[in-house]
Amino acid sequence: LEAVESSLTNGVSCITGGAGTGKTTVLRTVLKAYAALGYEIHAVALSGRAAMRLHESIGFFTMTIARMLREEPISPSLVQPKHLLVIDESSMIDLPTMYRIVTHLDPSVRIILTGDPNQLPPIGCGKVLSDIIESGAVANVELNIVKRQEGSTGIPEYSATINRGDVPPSLSFGAITFHETPPERVVDKCKTLYAESAHNTQIIGATKALVGELNLECQRLINPGGQRLEF
């Protein structure tokens, strides 16, 4: 309720929180209210896939930030005087991109930023969402209670615990299984697990050397007589 009220009463506001905390549900409610008040909704995301997911979640037309910037600036008119811009996954937006966005808008356009400041930072310079939140100059409501649903993997709860600096009560939880393995056995363990479902497995390593060794061992396991491609 606080997040909905904040988004409706402030010209610029943020709705933040980790996965599974209900950002999409809150945003859907806010946008329905704005639409009922006569606002034209402009919803954008950084990538095409993210824009598609946003459309599926909120039911309003969405586009990429790049496409929005190629179109005419968003400004009031006699036909449509009220506009709202929603920027999803805004933790991924760097400073130059945000500058281009705000200069593409009339000052009367309302803005809602959504995202998780604890996710990966932007590739370019500037951590816009984190800086906005830390400044306290823009209204922000953080959703910090994971709404676990039936069939949940448990990953949001697990990551939220780690984000708080706490050790999860159980290292294996939900769909997460922790294999206690000595360093010299990590590659063998990964190879064994990979063999169980090679086409549905992604292995992530901490170093390039480890990734190289894992790739080599998995290739030997799945395609022992294969030839390396030369470029």
Predicted regions and their residues:
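Residue-level marker for buried hydrophobic side chains located in beta-strands
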Residues: 85, 111-113
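Short hydrophobic/aromatic beta-strand immediately N-terminal to the Walker A/P-loop
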Residues: 13-16, 112, 202
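Walker B catalytic acidic pair
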Residues: 88-89, 115
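Conserved helicase motor core of P-loop NTPases
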Residues: 2, 6, 117-231
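A short acidic, amphipathic alpha-helical/loop segment
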Residues: 30, 97-101, 217
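ASCE P-loop NTPase motor cores of helicases and related translocases
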Residues: 1-85, 92, 133-148, 155-178
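Helix N-cap/beta->alpha junction signal
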Residues: 47, 94, 205-208
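Short, conserved "post-DEAD/DEAH" coupling segment immediately C-terminal to helicase motif II
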Residues: 95-109, 127-132
